[in-house]
Amino acid sequence: MLTKRIIPCLDVKEGRTVKGIHFENLTDVGDPVTLGQHYAREGADELVYLDISATQQGRNTFTQLVERIADGINIPFTVGGGIASLADASRLLDAGADKVSINSAAVARPELIEEIAQRYGSQFVVVAIDAKQRPDGEWYITTHGGTRFTDRELFAWAHEAQERGAGEILLTSMNHDGTRSGYPIPLFARLTADLRIPVIASGGAGCAGHIVEVLTAGGADAALAASIFHYGETTIAEVKQALAARGVSVRA
């Protein structure tokens, strides 16, 4: 049985870790390297750093930050945000990131998935998907932080990303993100059954039980969360204890 992974997510803006709902009303929650070290000590399996800076200056700061993270933590980490080309991905991987996460740019130009996978290998490529459920019940892809609907249906796009060389899918339900109301379990159960590659669940964790649920009933390979870890509402150790109690394999 593959070990289930717990992945804290750190949104970074102008070099600081921030947290808000739907990328708005952002609050500063600390230094990204210090926070990453804290989570590594707590037992995090991996980290995800998402650069939500809107400026080129912020992007440059992020590359320098990736070098600091690579020097400062001893667990794998993925970086994303603003990666629009192979050159962007190369810059961050060369700075020390273990994987890159691509989102809106992959929707706009799906060949980007293949370009990065062919250069570095699929294990370096995470395709992040921000999906939103429409009033008719269907799930569609959104871009630009969930603000723009596309005409791409979720399951078709996830399958295309897999075929183009994605090593993992990071799926966020924009309906649930930041609400702490739990993950949409039927959505993840369907997607994980549909794909060969690992699925990381994101968007909605409010307690350890929500994470346990998406990794068991939802079939996800990993769970990503931010608020509940940043604000100390639960710890990674508590989540892993709850998983172990359910007979789920976790890294100690």
Predicted regions: what is each one?
Residues 53, 62-120:
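Glycine/small-residue-rich loop that forms an oxyanion/phosphate-binding "nest" at active or ligand-binding sites
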Residues 57-78, 114-130, 181-201, 205-206, ...:
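Alpha-helix-loop-beta-strand connector modules within alpha/beta enzyme cores
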Residues 113-120, 213-252:
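C-terminal helical cap(s) of enzyme catalytic domains, especially alpha/beta-barrels
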Residues 46-64, 104, 170-181:
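Glycine-rich, proline-tolerant flexible connector loops at the mouths of alpha/beta enzymes
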Residues 11, 39, 47, 79, ...:
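Conserved, mostly hydrophobic/aromatic
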Residues 5-9, 46, 74-78, 99-101, ...:
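Structural preference for beta-strand elements that scaffold enzyme active sites
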Residues 12-14, 18, 98-171, 175-176:
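Conserved anion-binding
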Residues 77-78, 83-96, 186-223:
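Catalytic cores of alpha/beta
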